[in-house]
Amino acid sequence: MSRYWSDIVRQLEPYVPGEQPALAHPVKLNTNENPYPPSPRALDAIRRELGDTGEALRRYPDPVARRLRETVAAYHGIAPEQVFAGNGSDEVLAHAFQALLQHDRPLRFPDITYSFYPTYARLYRVAYETVPLADDFSIVVDDYLDDAGCVLFPNPNAPTGRALPLADIERIVAANPSSVVVIDEAYVDFGAESAVSLIARYPNLLVVHTVSKARSLAGMRVGFAFGDAALIDALTRVKDSFNSYPLDRLAQVATQASYEDEAWFQATRKQVIASRERLVGALAALGFDVVPSAANFVFARPRSHDAATLAAQLKQREIFVRHFKLPRIDQHLRITVGSDAECDALVAALRELLAA
């Protein structure tokens, strides 16, 4: 702490990102990255943009990512004016906190959810309330039907992996016409229904996507928001008051090419889903209680061992999973669905540790 810090910095509790181990060959199952490489078309697009000399890199990128937004809009069957592009979905969410979620009534989100939400709320001084999940970690829809303030939650939820059906999401959006409802769909491609189809009917709905998970582009930092043009304009006003050029040239062309390669997207998405079900079965056989998952990770509780101890023991073997020292979930592990070889290495290590 320094005497030069502002009051708000003194009060912050920063988000703690997942560990990025500096090892040659870790089994990295702690940050929900895709185990498969990006679309070959994305790699080709990067090479074309660079050319032989990298001449393009001396020029600023398109500040509004027009071609990318047009491609993504066409993919979802909406207008480009209904698409916002930002530097990762975390930045998109940050802009939403500033542009849309600061009101007299508190913002509401689940008590067990993406831990960046309370961090952003404190940073931007947004009053908030947490709404308890049910005992099975599902969102209780009736708790959000009172039009009592803005609503934010991931679907599927993180770190639990549980998803609400689209009909329940529509109930929440319809019941809150006076406030913005933000659905964070970082993991939607692995088993949930997207709410993008609802934005034409609900001007209060904002849906956030990322290319970090299903499209294997976490290193490019690209995220989107979809919603009524007035909501998108609000995000753009914040963006242009903060950073007019959030997406570099390589990120724009790689992401556009990724959306143009549907065959690759579907093949890798289905492989992750198949590997997830395989991992769920293996963990259950080892005595874990596994929460039903519609994401690219599983949330599991070892019945006979301490979760934090297991995570530490796995780390000693260069296998990384995520443990949260938080109420209600401190005996759970969040495990990314890796390649089958990575999942097999995890299961083999757990089998040895649980038998010791």
UniProtKB/Swiss-Prot annotation:
One GO term in the molecular function aspect is:
histidinol-phosphate transaminase activity
Q: Which CDD domains match?
A: AAT_like
Keyword vocabulary terms for this entry: Amino-acid biosynthesis, Aminotransferase, Histidine biosynthesis, Pyridoxal phosphate, Transferase
GO biological process terms held by the UniProt record: L-histidine biosynthetic process
Identify the metabolic or biological route this protein is part of: Amino-acid biosynthesis; L-histidine biosynthesis; L-histidine from 5-phospho-alpha-D-ribose 1-diphosphate: step 7/9
- Pfam families of this UniProt entry? Aminotran_1_2
Which superkingdom is the protein from?
Bacteria
Keyword Transferase part of the UniProt annotation: yes
Q: According to the UniProt record, list the residues that bear N6-(pyridoxal phosphate)lysine.
A: 213
Q: Which reaction does it catalyse?
A: L-histidinol phosphate + 2-oxoglutarate = 3-(imidazol-4-yl)-2-oxopropyl phosphate + L-glutamate
Q: Is Amino-acid biosynthesis one of the keywords?
A: yes
Cofactor(s) this protein requires: pyridoxal 5'-phosphate
The record's top EC class is: transferase
Its EC number is: 2.6.1.9
As for family, the record states: Belongs to the class-II pyridoxal-phosphate-dependent aminotransferase family. Histidinol-phosphate aminotransferase subfamily.
Q: Which PANTHER family match?
A: HISTIDINOL-PHOSPHATE AMINOTRANSFERASE (PTHR42885:SF2), HISTIDINOL-PHOSPHATE AMINOTRANSFERASE-RELATED (PTHR42885)
Describe the subunit structure.
Answer: Homodimer.
Q: What name appears for this protein in its UniProt entry?
A: Histidinol-phosphate aminotransferase 1
